[in-house]
A protein has these predicted regions:
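Bacterial N-terminal signal peptides that target proteins for export
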Residues: 1-13
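Residues embedded in well-ordered secondary-structure elements
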Residues: 15, 29, 82-84
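C-terminal segment of classical bacterial N-terminal signal peptides
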Residues: 15-24
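Immediate post-signal-peptide N-terminus of mature secreted/exported proteins
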Residues: 26-51
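Short hydrophobic/aromatic beta-strand micro-patches
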Residues: 43, 94-96
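An amphipathic, aromatic/His-enriched active-site/gating alpha helix that lines ligand/cofactor pockets
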Residues: 28-31, 62, 66-74, 96-149
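N-terminal, post-signal-peptide region of Sec/Tat-exported proteins
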Residues: 45-89
Length: 149
C-alpha cells in the first residue's frame, strides 16, 4: 500500500467514526425513553390485609400473568410498605408497560383478560366491587423511566 492509500483509508475511517458519534448524540439528550410504570396506591381495611394479599396471590396474579402472555404488560410487582398515617397506602401495585403506546385502548384488552381469568366481564366487575369492602384505591400515578446514556 502506498502512503497516499493509507492516508485516505485512515481519513475515511476517522470521518466514519465522527459521523457515527454525531448520529448517536443527534437528539442532544443524555437519556433514552424507558418503560412506562403505573403505581397504584392501595390501603387495606384494618383486619383484611391477609385477605387482600390472598386475592393478589391468586386472581390478581393470574390476571397479570395472562396480561404478560398477551403482551399487554412487561412486568408487575406488589410492594408492601409501612403506612405513616391512616391515610397512607400499605400496598403499591406496580405495573410496567413497554411504552406509552402500550396504554392505547388498554381497557378493552384488559376486559378480555379479566373475562378469561374470572369467567366474564360482569364477574370481574362484581369481584372488584366486593374488594371495595377490604381495600381502598387511594389513586395511581403513571411515569416513564429515563434511561441515562
Amino acid at each position: 500500500m502506498t502512503f497516499m492509500t493509507r492516508l485516505f483509508c485512515a481519513g475515511g475511517a476517522l470521518l466514519s467514526l465522527t459521523a457515527l458519534a454525531t448520529i448517536a448524540q443527534a437528539d442532544g439528550r443524555d437519556w433514552n425513553d424507558g418503560p412506562v410504570v403505573n403505581v397504584a396506591s392501595i390501603r387495606t381495611v384494618d383486619g383484611h390485609f391477609d385477605e387482600y394479599m390472598h386475592w393478589l396471590a391468586t386472581t390478581y396474579r393470574k390476571q397479570q400473568e395472562a396480561a404478560k402472555t398477551a403482551g399487554l404488560i412487561t412486568s408487575y410487582r406488589v410492594m408492601v410498605v409501612e403506612a405513616r398515617t391512616p391515610q397512607d397506602p400499605d400496598i403499591y401495585l406496580v405495573t410496567e408497560y413497554k411504552n406509552w403506546a402500550a396504554l392505547d385502548r388498554l381497557g378493552g384488552k384488559f376486559d378480555q383478560v379479566s373475562a378469561q381469568v374470572e369467567g366474564s366481564v360482569e364477574k370481574a366487575a362484581q369481584s372488584e366491587a366486593d374488594r371495595a369492602k377490604i381495600r381502598t384505591v387511594l389513586g395511581s400515578r403513571t411515569q416513564q423511566e429515563a434511561l441515562l446514556k
